[in-house]
Amino acid sequence: MTAFNVVRFRVKPGRENQFVDEHRKAKSDFPGLRHAALVKTGERTYCLVGEWDDMSSIVGAREGMIALLDRFRDTLEDLGGGLGVTDPVSGEVVLDLKR
């Protein structure tokens, strides 16, 4: 069943170009990843949205996704509330509204 992951970020002042460039250079060839997009949601805030074949594909890619995060972790601000520099969520699609 199709699954999505969404990761929320807040970038340090003056580091947005580096943050976006690291995503541009990234090899997003994780098995099961259908589509991924980096979305600017506000001033210095972004979400990465990934569409996957299934939850097991997301689980299998976690190590690689963490390695990718480590390349630009220093560009990120702590989100507070014990979250650290990312706020990730993932889950299976329960209703496909439009294709």
Where are these regions (language model features)?
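Short, low-order "capping/linker" segments at domain edges
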Residues: D87-R99
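Short, surface-exposed ligand-recognition loops at beta-strand->loop->(often short) alpha-helix junctions
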Residues: R8-F19
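An amphipathic, aromatic/His-enriched active-site/gating alpha helix that lines ligand/cofactor pockets
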Residues: R24-H35, E51-D87
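Active-site-flanking beta-strand signature of metal-NTP-handling nucleotidyl enzymes
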Residues: A3-F9, C47
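Non-catalytic surface loops within mature trypsin-like serine protease
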Residues: V11-P13, D54, L95
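Short catalytic/ligand-binding loop motif for oxyanion handling, primarily in non-cytosolic enzymes
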Residues: T45-Y46, I58
